[in-house]
Amino acid sequence: MAPARENVSLFFKLYCLTVMTLVAAAYTVALRYTRTTAEELYFSTTAVCITEVIKLLISVGLLAKETGSLGRFKASLSENVLGSPKELAKLSVPSLVYAVQNNMAFLALSNLDAAVYQVTYQLKIPCTALCTVLMLNRTLSKLQWISVFMLCGGVTLVQWKPAQATKVVVAQNPLLGFGAIAIAVLCSGFAGVYFEKVLKSSDTSLWVRNIQMYLSGIVVTLAGTYLSDGAEIQEKGFFYGYTYYVWFVIFLASVGGLYTSVVVKYTDNIMKGFSAAAAIVLSTIASVLLFGLQITLSFALGALLVCVSIYLYGLPRQDTTSIQQEATSKERIIGV
């Protein structure tokens, strides 16, 4: 088994952060498209459930590759999954919260404009920072707190757009959307930090932890599926309304979820939030190049704030020990 905090290269960390954020940006756009088209609307709860199944299968395959032999693979599953009901119960907490978060994200995107969703969802950054301080007993400097809130303001400006008429008229409930996004923000902060605490508090394999979480996640999401849409699913079918675009959204959600666990393992949840915000800026720039989107003053200012906030957060914290020792020495000299 790998140690709880393995030393990995900076390139690997940057690679994981980059892939995760690019996938997240594509996921938001694709998800919004599938929820606002005039076609038959699929059940979002079934998509969340299928995503959990795919992530479980991929994690099982990666654990098999990590163990290197069928015997060690079976032993690992027997010891850490089948023979560890307490660990399964421990990992059921984030899976339950993540399931709620995913369903709230679907609900919010169905009732809010994509830009409004992205802006309000950035509140997960200070929420995650607060959970990190409270749950992991870490401290953030004043400069880091400033950078966290500066990032929220920057992303808001980047995505600020005047109200426009959409081609597809969809019935929306903004109040319901904002309520859903508030729950999603709280779930994101708590579940992410809780999972980080579990990952880094033992030497258990990342893929074992994922399997433990996704097993309970499948049970939770499957139950939620039939509690929410059971009658309609029985009438129309589990895969009602599914298209290639819907399967693409599920694929993006699965890949993004796996990369997120790797990022949490080797960096932290706050860095994950900063990386996601940077991806929003990059995706907007790509829209300028590909689709002729006009750069606005608010975007330029917001992008600058995002870059500055990332730089400020990444600055090494000043070691005050030597300064305090020097001050104490001077006081002693003066006293003499």
Curated annotation (Swiss-Prot):
Outcome (variant: M20S): No effect on CDP-ribitol and CMP-sialic acid transport activity
Transmembrane segments: 10-30, 46-64, 88-108, 115-135, 142-160, 176-196, 210-228, 244-262, 270-288, 297-315
Protein family: Belongs to the nucleotide-sugar transporter family. SLC35A subfamily.
UniProt source species: Mus musculus
GO cellular component: Golgi membrane; membrane
Outcome when changing A24Y: Loss of CMP-sialic acid transport activity but no effect on CDP-ribitol transport activity
Stated consequence of mutating T260M: No effect on CDP-ribitol and CMP-sialic acid transport activity
Membrane topology: Multi-pass membrane protein
Protein name: CMP-sialic acid transporter
Consequence recorded when altering A105V: No effect on CDP-ribitol and CMP-sialic acid transport activity
